[in-house]
Amino acid sequence: MSKPWLFTVHGTGQPDPLGPGLPADTARDVLDIYRWQPIGNYPAAAFPMWPSVEKGVAELILQIELKLDADPYADFAMAGYSQGAIVVGQVLKHHILPPTGRLHRFLHRLKKVIFWGNPMRQKGFAHSDEWIHPVAAPDTLGILEDRLENLEQYGFEVRDYAHDGDMYASIKEDDLHEYEVAIGRIVMKASGFIGGRDSVVAQLIELGQRPITEGIALAGAIIDALTFFARSRMGDKWPHLYNRYPAVEFLRQI
């Protein structure tokens, strides 16, 4: 029987598909049982993020087709972190699961999917990475509006590692977090953090020109966002960092 393929996609700021990072480090730990295809030709850019995601989606689709068409007996798994989780989530939701999807013919060969810090996380669907951060609460979901749905009904297994306090992967459905979703939408489309009408700062100013009754929730969302990004310099204490070893063990269960 053919070795299964593992496709991995790095997060923002990690364009080297072979470099250090959760997906690649996880793959290196299971090379005895998987063939590994890291996704390159993908800038993993912070700004503008959505075009970067689209390039990652196109490359992941291409590599899945190339590898699985060449070996009709090979199963496969996918793993993505942060922006890479969006790439994997987009391919899964829009190209593998729909009967009309370009990759739907491979659905029965998909065995495992791993996400860390997933902005497309399905509400209430979260797993512990057995580390220092608590797992996301049952009433939380990913920050993007285009989220995964009904993952429990499919034949493949999923681990969606999400921490409480990870703004990308764990928000609630209330007024404050509605603005965090809007901030997430801004990050996807913005040309940069500051400078120009399409920067994050300019778009936040525009978002702030809302009725005064909405001001408290908006201010809270902006404070949450700025606090979250500031904590990225805190090392392991940043909730958007994850422990890979439960994912390694999960992949080994084949």
UniProtKB/Swiss-Prot annotation:
InterPro entries: AB_hydrolase_fold, Cutinase/axe, Lysin_B_C_ter
Catalytic-site annotation from UniProt: S82, D166, H240
Keywords from the UniProt entry: Antimicrobial, Bacteriolytic enzyme, Cytolysis, Host cell lysis by virus, Hydrolase, Viral release from host cell
Principal EC category: hydrolase
Highest taxon above the source species: Viruses
GO molecular function per UniProt: hydrolase activity
GO biological process, alphabetically ordered: defense response to bacterium; viral release from host cell by cytolysis
Listed EC numbers: 3.1.-.-
Keyword Hydrolase attributed: yes
Family membership noted in the UniProt record: Belongs to the L5likevirus endolysin B protein family.
Purpose: Endolysin that degrades the junction between mycolic acid and peptidoglycans in the host cell wall and participates with the holin protein in the sequential events which lead to the programmed host cell lysis releasing the mature viral particles. Once the holin has permeabilized the host cell membrane, the endolysin can reach the periplasm and break down the mycolic acid-rich outer membrane. Cleaves the ester linkage joining the mycolic acid-rich outer membrane to arabinogalactan, releasing free mycolic acids.
This protein's name: Endolysin B
